Structures are given as structure tokens and as C-alpha cells.
Amino acid sequence: MAKHLFTSESVSEGHPDKIADQISDAVLDAILEQDPKARVACETYVKTGMVMVGGEVTTSAWVDIEEITRETVREIGYVHSDMGFDANSCAVLNTIGKQSPDINQGVDKADPKEQGAGDQGIMFGYATNETPILMPAPITYSHLLVQKQAEVRKSGKLDFLRPDAKSQVTFQYDQGKIVGIDAVVLSTQHCDSVTTPDLREAVMEEIIKPVLPAEWLNKDTNFFINPTGRFVIGGPMGDCGLTGRKIIVDTYGGAARHGGGAFSGKDPSKVDRSAAYAARYVAKNIVAAGMADRCEIQLSYAIGVADPTSIMVETFGTEKVSHDIIIEAVRQNFDLRPYGLQEMLNLLQPIYKKTAAYGHFGREEFPWEATDKAAILRDFAGIK
């Protein structure tokens, strides 16, 4: 592929689907804090004036679902009916039940190391050296834009902004290298009193320019700031939100394949989540080791079975050592059984709420972003 465009999008923490994700993961964290081996599958639905939290949980812990829900919505910034949603007055419905014993018998084993996968499925992980964090640039900068929107909103610098927002960035590539940004879209909810020209100028000066590198912007870059001209009704009043509806935003912005399983609200026994994190960890360490410029990992599992049913490594012709060496390096240096994933990445801890907005990958505070295996892989492959 010579010259081409590639686009990714992100959404803010105040987007309805992201409200749902954050509530689901806040519940998960609260349970894991008391019971690290709990089984949790928590789903959330939000709409005007109400939140419904449901799913299946097996745990010795007790958590206050209503208070967790209200506090999460409060932190996001929906604290007044003028915004279309109010953490203090919305209804909170709890419909959580217990996990099926049929599932549990396949997961729990006498030997913890033989813990079976919580479900069948396919999971992908990806890394590329086009950014320092080994993530695709389009999704990286889309996340940074909506993170900046939240920052200037919460600090009061742009106090007319409201929590709901979306971003989209189109990058120009030539021979696989970034040469510029072709288009930027940023839509943000706002109060009724601000004018569209004032909002557009403020967003350009306080959000877009501080985030996007100037060398990638030029006279031909197209900027679309609130292109409809008005975005007062937003959040759950504008659209209902559901856990797990932003799986491409959560991962690689479409630059890599996706197995279809969502992350939020699931404890680490669910390989939809833990194996996707492990696949990112493997791919990132391969790229960090200099074994390839780009790497995609696919893992697959059968319910109740510990070992993956398959491991696939794709390097898109960018490998620096033989494909067989890369495959063998993965098999010998990464324990990809469910128990191994949890131990390798220290997943039985309450770290998930902060993953639920602005992407699960490319953020150094998460254990699956470590490149601690890179030196080992270099030695294995004989890379100097």
C-alpha cells in the first residue's frame, strides 16, 4: 500500500456507552477489592433518568451497587438535570444474579494452574512502532482529544462544555509512514448559552492545537468542530448507553482485528478480557524487542480448557527474524493459560475502572503495557 488514509474515532467518558462501561468496571473493582477470585459479569444500561445494572456474580463480597453507580456518574460530571442526567436523582435498578454452576465447574479446578477458560472465543492483540507507545496513531490521538476535552471541562477552563463528546482523526500515510493529518472531527456537548463560533474557536485553541503535533497539520487539513452547529442534548438523554458497545474504541481503532468480545464488567477469568490483554502484551514485547515493526497476535480458547486452542502471529512482512523463531519465542516465554495470564499480568486487582474510558491499550500504568520481556525475546532471537 503506497499512499492511503486511515481513520479512528474515540468517545469521552461522558458518552452514554462509556458511562455504562465505567459503571460495570466500578462494580467489578469494588468486588475484586474484597474478593479477588470473584466471578463477575456486570452489564449496565443507561437512559434518561435511570441506570440498570445486571449480570451474574459469584462472590463473598457485598458492595453497594447504587452508591457505586451514583458516584461513578458524579465523577464523570452529570450532576444536574440541565445536563440531561443527574447522578443524585436518577433511578438505579439492580438486577444482578448468580453465575451458572454449569460454567463454574468448567473454570475452577483442584489445581489452580489448570483453571479452564471462562468461555470459548477468539482474541487479538496488536502493536506497531509508528508511535512511542507502540499503538496506531489514529486511535492514540483520537483518545488524546477527548481526554483533553474532559480536562478543560473539569478544570473550568471551558466551563460551557458538557461531558458527552466524540473525536475522529484521519491520518495520511505514504509507504506505511505518517506524513500528515487529513481530517479532524470533534463534537462536544455544550451549554445552551455558548455560540457556535465561540465554541469552535475555543475547541481549536484549547483542545485540538495543544494535542495534535503541528508538523502533521497543514493548510489542507480539514477541521470539523460540532459540524451540526448544536449539541446541547447529549449523554443518556440523547442516546441510551450499553456496556460493551465501543469495542473498537477500546482497542486499536480498527487498525487490527477484533474477536468480538467486550471487556468492561468482566473479571479476569473471562478470556475475552484477560487474553486480549495478554495478546497486546505479547505483541508489544515482540515489537519492542525489534523482532518486527508490526505484530498481531490471535489467541483462541475452549470453555473449561486451560491451554489455548491456537496461537497465531502475523507480522505483515515486517519481521526482522524468521517467523518460526517468533512463534517459538512466544510459546517458550509467555504462559497463555488463564491462570498464567492472571499471574503474568497481575490481573486479580481492582484496576479496571480506569480502563473503561480512553482505551485499554497504550497507557503505561497498566501491566499489559510493560515491555519487560523485550530483552528476553531479543536474546532468544539473537538480536544484538
Curated annotation (Swiss-Prot):
InterPro entries: ADOMET_SYNTHASE_CS, S-AdoMet_synt_C, S-AdoMet_synt_central, S-AdoMet_synt_N, S-AdoMet_synthetase, S-AdoMet_synthetase_sfam. It comes from the Bacteria. It catalyses: L-methionine + ATP + H2O = S-adenosyl-L-methionine + phosphate + diphosphate. ATP binds at residues 15, 164-166, 230-231, 239, 245-246, 262, 266. SUPFAM superfamilies: S-adenosylmethionine synthetase (SSF55973). Its cofactor is Mg(2+); K(+). Residues 99-109 are annotated as: Flexible loop. Its main location: cytoplasm. Gene3D superfamilies: 3.30.300.10. It is found in: Cytoplasm. It is an enzyme of class 2 (transferase). One of its GO terms (molecular function) is ATP binding. It holds the Pfam family S-AdoMet_synt_N. One of its GO terms (cellular component) is cytoplasm. Belongs to the AdoMet synthase family. PANTHER family: S-ADENOSYLMETHIONINE SYNTHETASE (PTHR11964). This is S-adenosylmethionine synthase.
